[in-house]
Amino acid sequence: MMNQPKVSVIMGIYNCENTLAQAIDSILAQTYTNWELILCDDGSTDGTYALAQKYKDQYPDQIILLKNERNRKLSYTLNRCLEAATGELIARMDGDDISHKDRLEKQVAYLLGHPAIQLVGCAMRRFDEKGVHDIMHPVTAPDKWTLRYRVPFYHATILTRRIVYDTLHGYTDEDRATRVEDRDLWFRFYANGFSGANIDEALYDVRENADTIKRRTALSRFQSLRTTVYGYRLLGYPKRWLLREVFALIAKSVIPYRAKQWFRDRRKNNGES
């Protein structure tokens, strides 16, 4: 690839001491070499920051390490990463996931080959301590209507032109966007006339366990509804469409955690995606 724009990989890290090395190593192993990794520790109480510092000391020219004075949640943390980023392109990454070695190479090539596209995501594999159990396939050409029935992009997989974050002023650091900062981003992304696409190839592995489901609390679902109301108004969706979201929120709130875990385990055993 002749033209190699710099990619800033932004990663908020919090209490991920046991998985962080694997995440960072997957970036170090990228076939695309013009990148910087920006880590921001969000007030971890384990050895996460110390481990990140070791990597920073070993790769001082490629890794930038920041630290919040206290736990400020993901939106604030990612905005700090964006402030430090110097790349033309911005990639997301989580501290407990894995990027395939050719992820950046293929996503950069896609953006360079599609100048009308400002963001590209990809399919991703879900895995746990037992191994990979399914692949999540995205809509390859999502638009603003996609948000009505599913997410247009898997947040941690995206590579974005810097102009997107500059135009949107980063992530919304408000209570209503807590744990749904990605959904808020998609609403504002489409409201500003941007276009995105997905590569239907798994270039990213996302780690899932019992804590992943437990974190999807009633409060986070309520925040999702608040953000949905905001987004539907922003994009001019009919008010009646909100009824579907309200009913979905009620249904999810009354289903107990054990039932959700049983359903997910059953899907894994049946090989369903």
Residue spans of the language-model regions?
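Catalytic core of nucleotide-sugar-dependent glycosyltransferases
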Residues: 190-194, 214-237
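Short aromatic/hydrophobic "clamp" motif used to bind/position activated sugar donors
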Residues: 90
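N-proximal low-complexity "stem/linker" segments adjacent to membrane-targeting elements
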Residues: 1-28
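A conserved acidic beta->alpha catalytic loop
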Residues: 41-50, 70, 94
